[in-house]
Amino acid sequence: MSWSSHPPSVIFYILSLLSSACLAYVATRDNCCILDERFGSYCPTTCGIADFLNNYQTSVDKDLRTLEGILYQVENKTSEARELVKAIQISYNPDQPSKPNNIESATKNSKSMMEEIMKYETLISTHESTIRFLQEVYNSNSQKIVNLRDKVVQLEANCQEPCQDTVKIHDVTGRDCQDVANKGAKESGLYFIRPLKAKQFLVYCEIDGSGNGWTVFQKRLDGSLDFKKNWIQYKEGFGHLSPTGTGNTEFWLGNEKIHLISTQSSIPYVLRIQLEDWNGRTSTADYASFKVTGENDKYRLTYAYFIGGDAGDAFDGYDFGDDSSDKFFTSHNGMQFSTWDSDNDKYDGNCAEQVGIGWWMNKCHAGHLNGVYYQGGTYSKTSTPNGYDNGIIWATWKSRWYSMKKTTMKIIPLNRLAIGEGQQHQLGGAKQVGVEHHVEIEYD
């Protein structure tokens, strides 16, 4: 590309036309489909792409202004070079005989002029390369803007009709999922519940053929959700509740909601932990009288006793062989919840900060179902940022260096545990409270 073949005025004119073609698209609630905030993104919307288009256009306009400035500098430098060449041509007369006393002076002047010409030629070449690069960037950005506008048009066409929610939320409501099942609900899925002294919120209820209604508050499936969250996020909950019985999303219901459910009834709740390894083997661990206190007590976890389950009682701690006090300092009963920005554990440091994830920490843990998701299960000290076991672990079933493939944490009133599912053999200590037959749940 030569400078003479692309006059600056022409390039400026082209750039001006291209810049004026970037029209801003302002997204409002009138021209976007606004979905109910309770659900995930189940309907197409133009708002996100429109916002991105506006931001992207601002960046392109800035690049254009920079390009115009560079072109202006190049034009000035080129004009200076042309004037210099013209002056050389005028001063040079081949017919005039050289005077001996002027030879040295003329030689110096010629050398200086040649150096100036070479300098300007180098500068022009550099600016031409910059112009070519910026032109390529501009062309690429222009094409991206065109593509985004096409997508906006497509989405606007799709949203001419009111968006239809594809999420099925059942009409039955109750204090928890067992109350929902008692009122006739027979299908697992999304339900609104309203615990005592609380506003209603959405939960996933797992309802079996025996009428047992489990309220699910944690799900790990595939590592698609990052559990490295702060205190507020763990309090409010994060992730998406699955609208289908397959349970195909990961989520944490929220510490405040878990507290409201687990402390509302005179009948205690059972916590069931379900685990699956990377070979498809499953196991469970059940805990009686599970509760989570309020935020003023840092959402402290408590339970009465371990009922049973082939996963073992990791909440009671585990002797890793590192120290004689391992089991005591890795137990979880009575521990407050900790996150990287709210240290409430028994360790001098911050266990949650070491692993980056919220949990009921001691010094630190024998079971951690919110841990880092490791594909394939096995990991080692060298694969962690600081050498600590930070996977999805349950030390009484698998090694601390084995991360589970799937986990579920769910609760149900204690008087339902022995009904169906062949759970009678797991009651163990539950017989101490005299639960031998079906009793409908009662609330204070």
UniProtKB/Swiss-Prot annotation:
Signal peptide positions (record): 1-24
Protein name: Fibrinogen gamma-B chain
Membrane-crossing segments per the record: none
UniProt note: domains: A long coiled coil structure formed by 3 polypeptide chains connects the central nodule to the C-terminal domains (distal nodules). The long C-terminal ends of the alpha chains fold back, contributing a fourth strand to the coiled coil structure.
Predominant location: secreted
Compartments reported by the entry: Secreted
Keywords from the named record: Blood coagulation, Calcium, Coiled coil, Disulfide bond, Glycoprotein, Hemostasis, Metal-binding, Secreted, Signal
Coiled-coil zones: 25-165
Gene3D superfamilies: 1.20.5.50, Gamma Fibrinogen, chain A, domain 1, Gamma-fibrinogen Carboxyl Terminal Fragment, domain 2
Subunit note: Heterohexamer; disulfide linked. Contains 2 sets of 3 non-identical chains (alpha, beta and gamma). The 2 heterotrimers are in head to head conformation with the N-termini in a small central domain.
Chain residues that bind Ca(2+): D343, D345, Y347, G349
Glycosites: N76
